[in-house]
Protein backbone atom coordinates (compact mmCIF):
# COMPACT_ATOMS: atom_id res chain seq x y z
CA UNK A 1 0.00 0.00 0.00
CA UNK A 2 0.88 3.67 -0.02
CA UNK A 3 1.57 3.87 3.72
CA UNK A 4 3.87 0.88 4.34
CA UNK A 5 7.66 0.57 4.04
CA UNK A 6 8.07 4.26 3.20
CA UNK A 7 11.35 4.19 5.13
CA UNK A 8 12.84 2.19 2.24
CA UNK A 9 12.34 4.85 -0.42
CA UNK A 10 9.89 6.37 -2.86
CA UNK A 11 6.89 4.61 -4.39
CA UNK A 12 6.95 3.54 -8.03
CA UNK A 13 3.36 4.39 -8.88
CA UNK A 14 2.55 2.91 -12.27
CA UNK A 15 3.67 1.49 -15.61
CA UNK A 16 2.71 3.54 -18.67
CA UNK A 17 3.87 2.91 -22.23
CA UNK A 18 3.22 4.66 -25.53
CA UNK A 19 3.55 1.18 -27.10
CA UNK A 20 0.25 0.29 -25.43
CA UNK A 21 -1.29 3.75 -25.84
CA UNK A 22 -1.83 3.98 -22.09
CA UNK A 23 0.38 7.01 -21.46
CA UNK A 24 -1.55 10.26 -21.47
CA UNK A 25 0.00 13.24 -19.66
CA UNK A 26 -3.28 14.27 -18.06
CA UNK A 27 -3.88 10.72 -16.77
CA UNK A 28 -0.53 10.81 -15.00
CA UNK A 29 -1.23 14.31 -13.67
CA UNK A 30 -4.71 13.28 -12.51
CA UNK A 31 -3.38 10.28 -10.59
CA UNK A 32 -0.87 12.47 -8.77
CA UNK A 33 -3.47 15.19 -8.16
CA UNK A 34 -6.01 12.77 -6.69
CA UNK A 35 -3.50 10.97 -4.51
CA UNK A 36 -1.83 14.13 -3.20
CA UNK A 37 -4.67 14.83 -0.78
CA UNK A 38 -3.98 11.54 1.01
CA UNK A 39 -0.38 10.55 0.19
CA UNK A 40 2.75 12.74 0.29
CA UNK A 41 3.22 13.64 -3.37
CA UNK A 42 6.98 13.98 -2.93
CA UNK A 43 7.15 10.25 -2.14
CA UNK A 44 5.66 9.20 -5.49
CA UNK A 45 7.74 8.52 -8.60
CA UNK A 46 5.81 10.09 -11.48
CA UNK A 47 6.72 9.20 -15.05
CA UNK A 48 7.19 11.22 -18.19
CA UNK A 49 7.86 9.43 -21.46
CA UNK A 50 9.55 9.89 -24.81
CA UNK A 51 6.78 11.72 -26.67
CA UNK A 52 8.42 11.08 -30.06
CA UNK A 53 7.87 7.31 -29.89
CA UNK A 54 4.77 5.60 -31.29
CA UNK A 55 3.07 8.80 -32.45
CA UNK A 56 1.25 6.82 -35.14
CA UNK A 57 -0.50 4.70 -32.52
CA UNK A 58 -2.38 7.73 -31.17
CA UNK A 59 -3.74 8.96 -34.51
CA UNK A 60 -5.62 12.26 -34.19
CA UNK A 61 -6.09 11.97 -30.43
CA UNK A 62 -5.95 15.56 -29.05
CA UNK A 63 -4.40 14.28 -25.81
CA UNK A 64 -1.62 12.27 -27.44
CA UNK A 65 1.77 12.82 -25.77
CA UNK A 66 3.36 14.32 -28.88
CA UNK A 67 0.87 17.22 -28.79
CA UNK A 68 2.55 18.59 -25.65
CA UNK A 69 5.96 20.15 -25.21
CA UNK A 70 8.57 17.97 -23.54
CA UNK A 71 8.89 20.67 -20.88
CA UNK A 72 5.19 20.34 -20.08
CA UNK A 73 5.47 16.56 -19.74
CA UNK A 74 8.28 17.05 -17.23
CA UNK A 75 6.27 19.73 -15.42
CA UNK A 76 3.38 17.30 -14.82
CA UNK A 77 5.74 15.30 -12.59
CA UNK A 78 7.30 18.12 -10.57
CA UNK A 79 5.07 17.82 -7.49
CA UNK A 80 6.29 14.23 -7.19
CA UNK A 81 9.65 12.66 -7.97
CA UNK A 82 10.15 13.03 -11.75
CA UNK A 83 10.87 9.69 -13.39
CA UNK A 84 12.31 9.72 -16.93
CA UNK A 85 10.64 6.50 -18.07
CA UNK A 86 12.54 5.98 -21.32
CA UNK A 87 15.93 5.21 -22.85
CA UNK A 88 17.71 8.55 -23.16
CA UNK A 89 19.79 7.19 -26.06
CA UNK A 90 16.62 7.10 -28.19
CA UNK A 91 15.70 10.76 -27.68
CA UNK A 92 16.01 13.20 -30.58
CA UNK A 93 18.41 16.11 -30.20
CA UNK A 94 15.60 18.59 -29.54
CA UNK A 95 14.65 16.72 -26.36
CA UNK A 96 17.82 17.87 -24.63
CA UNK A 97 16.55 21.44 -24.64
CA UNK A 98 14.76 20.43 -21.43
CA UNK A 99 18.04 20.59 -19.53
CA UNK A 100 17.63 24.26 -18.57
CA UNK A 101 14.22 23.61 -17.00
CA UNK A 102 15.54 20.60 -15.10
CA UNK A 103 18.50 22.52 -13.72
CA UNK A 104 16.27 25.34 -12.50
CA UNK A 105 13.80 22.86 -11.00
CA UNK A 106 16.58 21.11 -9.07
CA UNK A 107 17.36 24.41 -7.33
CA UNK A 108 13.86 24.64 -5.81
CA UNK A 109 12.90 20.95 -5.65
CA UNK A 110 14.06 20.39 -2.08
CA UNK A 111 12.30 23.46 -0.71
CA UNK A 112 9.16 22.73 -2.75
CA UNK A 113 9.03 19.19 -1.38
CA UNK A 114 9.52 20.34 2.23
CA UNK A 115 5.99 21.74 2.23
CA UNK A 116 2.68 19.91 2.49
CA UNK A 117 1.67 19.41 -1.15
CA UNK A 118 -2.07 19.50 -1.83
CA UNK A 119 -4.23 19.60 -5.00
CA UNK A 120 -5.68 22.91 -6.20
CA UNK A 121 -8.01 23.91 -9.01
CA UNK A 122 -10.03 21.45 -11.05
CA UNK A 123 -9.43 17.73 -11.45
CA UNK A 124 -7.12 17.20 -14.44
CA UNK A 125 -9.18 16.20 -17.47
CA UNK A 126 -7.10 17.44 -20.39
CA UNK A 127 -9.35 20.55 -20.45
CA UNK A 128 -8.90 21.94 -16.92
CA UNK A 129 -7.06 24.55 -14.91
CA UNK A 130 -5.37 22.52 -12.21
CA UNK A 131 -2.29 22.27 -10.03
CA UNK A 132 -0.70 21.90 -6.61
CA UNK A 133 0.12 24.07 -3.63
CA UNK A 134 3.10 23.43 -1.37
CA UNK A 135 2.44 24.94 2.06
CA UNK A 136 5.95 25.44 3.39
CA UNK A 137 5.20 27.89 6.22
CA UNK A 138 2.16 29.85 7.36
CA UNK A 139 3.21 32.83 5.23
CA UNK A 140 4.85 31.29 2.15
CA UNK A 141 5.01 28.35 -0.18
CA UNK A 142 4.63 27.43 -3.84
CA UNK A 143 1.85 27.30 -6.42
CA UNK A 144 2.28 24.99 -9.43
CA UNK A 145 -0.47 25.75 -11.94
CA UNK A 146 -1.35 24.12 -15.26
CA UNK A 147 -3.56 25.35 -18.05
CA UNK A 148 -4.66 22.29 -19.99
CA UNK A 149 -6.24 22.40 -23.45
CA UNK A 150 -9.07 24.87 -22.81
CA UNK A 151 -10.21 28.24 -24.16
CA UNK A 152 -9.86 30.14 -20.86
CA UNK A 153 -6.76 32.33 -20.91
CA UNK A 154 -7.54 33.36 -17.34
CA UNK A 155 -9.62 31.87 -14.58
CA UNK A 156 -10.16 31.64 -10.83
CA UNK A 157 -8.38 28.72 -9.16
CA UNK A 158 -9.28 27.43 -5.70
CA UNK A 159 -6.25 27.16 -3.41
CA UNK A 160 -5.50 26.62 0.27
CA UNK A 161 -4.69 30.31 0.77
CA UNK A 162 -6.72 32.16 3.44
CA UNK A 163 -9.60 34.30 2.18
CA UNK A 164 -8.82 38.02 2.14
CA UNK A 165 -5.04 37.59 2.29
CA UNK A 166 -2.77 39.84 0.24
CA UNK A 167 -0.39 37.60 -1.69
CA UNK A 168 2.67 38.29 -3.82
CA UNK A 169 3.45 35.57 -6.38
CA UNK A 170 6.94 35.49 -7.90
CA UNK A 171 7.45 33.31 -11.00
CA UNK A 172 10.13 30.62 -10.65
CA UNK A 173 9.52 28.31 -13.64
CA UNK A 174 7.27 28.32 -16.68
CA UNK A 175 5.49 31.31 -18.17
CA UNK A 176 3.89 33.03 -15.21
CA UNK A 177 4.29 36.76 -14.54
CA UNK A 178 4.83 38.61 -11.28
CA UNK A 179 1.45 38.89 -9.60
CA UNK A 180 0.02 40.63 -6.54
CA UNK A 181 -3.48 39.51 -5.66
CA UNK A 182 -6.13 39.38 -2.95
CA UNK A 183 -7.46 35.93 -2.16
CA UNK A 184 -11.18 35.52 -2.78
CA UNK A 185 -13.84 33.18 -1.40
CA UNK A 186 -12.78 29.54 -0.97
CA UNK A 187 -9.17 30.56 -1.43
CA UNK A 188 -9.59 31.55 -5.07
CA UNK A 189 -7.00 33.57 -6.96
CA UNK A 190 -7.16 34.83 -10.53
CA UNK A 191 -4.45 33.39 -12.80
CA UNK A 192 -3.64 33.59 -16.50
CA UNK A 193 -1.57 31.82 -19.13
CA UNK A 194 -1.80 32.84 -22.80
CA UNK A 195 -1.01 29.39 -24.22
CA UNK A 196 -2.79 26.06 -23.85
CA UNK A 197 -0.97 23.10 -22.31
CA UNK A 198 1.36 25.32 -20.35
CA UNK A 199 2.38 25.71 -16.71
CA UNK A 200 3.87 28.09 -14.16
CA UNK A 201 5.51 27.65 -10.78
CA UNK A 202 5.21 30.53 -8.33
CA UNK A 203 6.78 31.16 -4.97
CA UNK A 204 4.12 32.99 -2.96
CA UNK A 205 4.34 35.15 0.14
CA UNK A 206 1.42 36.32 2.26
CA UNK A 207 1.93 39.95 3.26
Language model: regions and residue ranges:
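Active-site-proximal substrate-binding groove within the catalytic cores of carbohydrate-active enzymes
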Residues: 1-180, 193-195, 199-203
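Short strand-edge motifs at loop-to-beta-strand transitions and within beta-strands
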Residues: 187-189
Amino acid sequence: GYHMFNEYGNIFLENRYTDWQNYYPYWTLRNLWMLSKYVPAEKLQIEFLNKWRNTEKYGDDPFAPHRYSFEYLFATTMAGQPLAWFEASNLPEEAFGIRDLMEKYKKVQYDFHQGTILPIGEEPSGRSWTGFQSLCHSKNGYLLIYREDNAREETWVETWLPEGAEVMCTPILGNGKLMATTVGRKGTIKVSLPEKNDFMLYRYEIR
